[in-house]
Amino acid sequence: MISIITLTCLVMMVIPAAVGNILAYPVSKKLSVRISNYIVKVLAPRFFAILKKYRKFNFWGYNDSKKQLPENFTVISNHQSLIDIPVYMNYFREKEIRFVAKDQLARHIPLVSEMLRAQQHCMIPRKARPMDAMNYIEKFGKRAVEKKQVPVIFPEGTRTKDGLVGKFYSAGFRMLEASTNLPVAVCALDGGYSLRSLTSFFRNLKRGCYRVKVLKVYNPPKSKEECNKILEEARVLIQNQLDEWKPLSSDQK
């Protein structure tokens, strides 16, 4: 089980920023943005540092793979747990990362919900009509380009239930690319499947690990066919990378 020291450190790290942002968001969006930026730039790396110190939990970010990235790009990735969000914030800490996600994340999740709203991530209502969802993504994409942010989308649409890469759905990705015209970085992450629930998080945290890597960068797709081809190839690339990581122990990079 998670140690008292680890839990105490995490709680002491989270509470001031979480409470501060809850209080700030309704009265001052600028202050909430400042707190949210602190959460992303300072607390996300500190979160993994605490886990490594007290639970021997490793964060393996393959930074050499980022050398192929252009200045501006879109990320498509597999999706394993809610921790995927701080994982990408930590991995791309030199960038301004913005996620396409369900709007449930923007409510009642300490540290996360106000941050996602203040930073204007793309929060899509679960019951949104397809056309409305596309409008959300289109506006989000244009805003990301204008502010030189990196949009991140999980084409599976939901977290994996078995650790395997699920079907990649194309509609959201196509709209995002139509509104941004950015190169596409295919990224793989692994380690979240064993931490996808609160119970499994506490049970599997010790000597676990998270891995994230850029696999390939595509030129901006110009058609529906090119978008579909990227998604098909990306799914295979990611699954192959997960298979390659599978034999490694948590302390092996």
Across the structure, where does each feature detected by a protein language model lie?
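Residue-level preference for the first positions of well-ordered beta-strands
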Residues: 72-74, 148-154, 183
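Membrane-interfacial terminal anchoring regions of lipid-handling membrane enzymes
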Residues: 1-42, 65-69, 143, 192, ...
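Catalytic core of membrane glycerolipid acyltransferases/transacylases, capturing the structured
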Residues: 25-26, 30, 69-128
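A conditional alpha-helix N-cap/helix-loop micro-motif detector
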Residues: 81, 130-134, 166
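A cross-family acyltransferase "interaction/gating" segment
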Residues: 111-113, 150, 161-225
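N-terminal signal-anchor transmembrane helix
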Residues: 25-78, 87-90
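Soluble extracytoplasmic domains of inner/organellar membrane proteins
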Residues: 138-142, 150-151, 156-164
